[in-house]
């Protein structure tokens, strides 16, 4: 669900940019900052990893209602979200380096 909200935020920003480029007025003035979105994404990654770790601990302690397949699925989701975060960081660093190497 959080990933869908993040994607919707990116799509709305792209639509607003496209409308601004074509000279149209945007109907919804969203004041979402890039830093805020990045911070929220990092918080979601951290929350997902924490939840997976807690569920793994509960499974290890033998709490009823915790299935191995649920633990493995949550661990995999946490791993994929971490890898996605790393790739986003790599792209941001590459874009920053490219901008810094431009001649003015």
Curated annotation (Swiss-Prot):
Provide the disulphide bond pattern. none
Keyword Cytoplasm in the entry? The reply is: no
What does the record list as coiled-coil region(s)? none
Q: Which residues form the signal peptide?
A: none
Major site of localization recorded for this protein? other
Name the UniProt key words of this record, in alphabetical order: Bacterial flagellum
Q: Which GO terms describe its biological process?
A: bacterial-type flagellum-dependent cell motility
Q: What are the subcellular locations of this protein?
A: Bacterial flagellum basal body
User: Organism's domain of life?
Assistant: Bacteria
- Would you name any one GO CC term? bacterial-type flagellum basal body
Which Gene Ontology molecular-function terms are recorded?
Answer: cytoskeletal motor activity; structural molecule activity
Entry protein name: Flagellar hook-basal body complex protein FliE
């Amino acid at each position: 669900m959080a990933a869908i909200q993040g994607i919707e935020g990116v799509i709305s920003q792209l639509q607003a940019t496209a409308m601004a480029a074509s000279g149209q007025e945007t109907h919804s003035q969203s004041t979402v900052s890039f830093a805020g979105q990045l911070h929220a994404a990092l918080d979601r990654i951290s929350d997902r990893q924490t939840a997976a770790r807690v569920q793994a601990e509960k499974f290890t302690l033998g709490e009823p209602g915790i299935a191995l397949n649920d633990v493995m699925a949550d661990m995999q989701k946490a791993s994929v979200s971490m890898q996605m975060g790393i790739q986003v960081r790599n792209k941001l660093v590459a874009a920053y380096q490219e901008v810094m190497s431009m001649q003015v």
